[in-house]
Swiss-Prot record:
Ranges where the Radical SAM core domain occurs: 94-314
Organism name: Porphyromonas gingivalis (strain ATCC BAA-308 / W83)
One GO cellular component, as annotated: cytoplasm
Protein name in UniProt: Probable dual-specificity RNA methyltransferase RlmN
Catalytic activity field: adenosine(2503) in 23S rRNA + 2 reduced [2Fe-2S]-[ferredoxin] + 2 S-adenosyl-L-methionine = 2-methyladenosine(2503) in 23S rRNA + 5'-deoxyadenosine + L-methionine + 2 oxidized [2Fe-2S]-[ferredoxin] + S-adenosyl-L-homocysteine; adenosine(37) in tRNA + 2 reduced [2Fe-2S]-[ferredoxin] + 2 S-adenosyl-L-methionine = 2-methyladenosine(37) in tRNA + 5'-deoxyadenosine + L-methionine + 2 oxidized [2Fe-2S]-[ferredoxin] + S-adenosyl-L-homocysteine
Family from the record: Belongs to the radical SAM superfamily. RlmN family.
Residues that coordinate or bind [4Fe-4S] cluster: C108, C112, C115
InterPro entries: Aldolase_TIM (IPR013785), Methyltransferase_A (IPR040072), RlmN_N (IPR048641), RNA_MTrfase_RlmN (IPR027492), rRNA_lsu_MTrfase_RlmN/Cfr (IPR004383), rSAM (IPR007197)
Disulfide bonds: C101-C325
Cofactor: binding comment: Binds 1 [4Fe-4S] cluster. The cluster is coordinated with 3 cysteines and an exchangeable S-adenosyl-L-methionine.
Comment field (misc): Reaction proceeds by a ping-pong mechanism involving intermediate methylation of a conserved cysteine residue.
GO aspect biological process, one term: rRNA base methylation
Name of the gene: rlmN
Residues that, per the record, bind S-adenosyl-L-methionine: G153, E154, S185, S206, L207, H208, H282
Keywords from the named record: 4Fe-4S, Cytoplasm, Disulfide bond, Iron, Iron-sulfur, Metal-binding, Methyltransferase, rRNA processing, S-adenosyl-L-methionine, Transferase, tRNA processing
Length: 341
């Protein structure tokens, strides 16, 4: 697929086909700036070369197959990504902002207790083209102001393709977005150091408990990617510039919502310039956890602020269409596809 290729790769494509070197830049402009969906649109490339391109290459653009709309304006898109596989993307409009939450894997290996995506298992990484197609193909593509890699999957378990997609989004030959418009979420997976070194996008870390043993029960990935090691890596990086790091903390009733947890959270984050986002737990099937109530979340927030941290309670969006944090799953769509085939 041409979508997801770098300028260098597109130039190589052009040269292999006997086209002039500058045709690589033409291809990049048509793919990333003009967002062409068909080679026939590329009118400054000869008809003969357009035909050859179409015979050899897939442009990588395809439409969504379903969309659901929430009462709060949130929209959830379903995208096919190969035979019988799907991913979901979520559009979150808010005032003059439009944030798209995109997926990086089909399912997820991390198997977090509170997340529906992990319950469906892992069925492959997305290519850079499949990641970018989500951005290009939603109805609101031209209105997007921010991107968050917080959909299905662990982005830094698919570091190569995630970084390729970010390159196409932020380089001048691509979409030319500021990295400040993009946030990548992780539990602290193996690609963290490379992400910090090779991109300038914001980082969000899924934390959820300051106590490693408790976190391991909620997030089995703690065994392979200990939070304390993740925090050491983050401390070693200079976040004094415009790049930000935030920590996501789902607040569970009677589990991690007391002042002991708040104080320990403050202790382990000491010295890291960061924001803490408190998130309500959204009920999913076969999981007995419950969300903490507003009063306890507010008390937790104030305690974190007393320790000198910026702490906010994040608004829930799209819960009625299973588009809120931890609720994305394409198991039903994939099951329906299998039955119809």
């Amino acid at each position: 697929m041409l979508l997801g290729m770098s300028l260098e790769e597109l130039t190589t494509v052009a040269l292999r086909m006997g086209m002039p070197r500058f045709a690589g830049k033409q291809l990049a402009e048509w793919i990333y700036v003009r967002r062409a969906t068909d080679f026939a649109e590329m009118t400054n490339i000869s008809q003969a070369n357009r035909q050859k391109l179409a015979e050899i290459y897939d442009l990588g653009r395809y439409p969504w197959s379903d969309v659901q709309c929430s009462v709060d304006g949130t929209k959830k898109y379903l995208f096919p990504v190969g035979e019988g596989r799907f991913v979901e993307s979520v559009l979150i409009p808010e005032g003059d902002r439009a944030t798209l939450c995109i997926s990086s894997q089909v399912g997820c290996k991390m198997d977090c207790l509170f997340c529906m995506t992990g319950k469906q298992g892992w069925n492959g990484n997305l290519s850079a083209a499949e990641i970018l197609n989500q951005i290009f193909s939603v109805d609101e593509a031209a209105e997007l102001t921010n991107l968050v890699y917080m959909g299905m999957g662990e982005p830094l378990d698919n570091t190569d393709e995630v970084l390729r997609s970010i390159e196409a989004l932020t380089e001048p030959w691509g979409m030319g977005w500021s990295p400040k418009r993009i946030t990548v979420s992780t539990i602290g997976a193996k690609g963290l150091e490379r992400f910090l070194a090779e991109s300038r996008c914001h980082l969000a870390v899924s934390l959820h408990s300051p106590f490693p043993e408790e976190r391991r029960k909620l997030m089995p990935g703690e065994k392979a990617f200990p939070i304390m090691q993740t925090l050491d890596r983050i401390r070693a990086y200079d976040f004094s510039g415009q790049r930000r790091v935030s920590f996501e903390y789902i607040v569970f009733d009677g589990l991690n919502d007391d002042m002991r947890h708040a104080d320990e959270l403050a202790a382990i984050l000491r010295g890291i310039p960061c924001r803490i986002n408190l998130i309500r737990f959204h009920k999913i099937p076969a999981v007995s956890l419950r969300s903490s109530d507003t009063a306890r979340m507010e008390a937790f927030r104030k305690r974190m602020e007393s320790h000198g941290f910026t702490c906010t309670i994040r608004a829930s969006r799209g819960e009625d269409i299973f588009a809120a944090c931890g609720m994305l799953s394409t198991s039903k769509a994939e099951s329906s596809e299998e039955k119809s085939s």
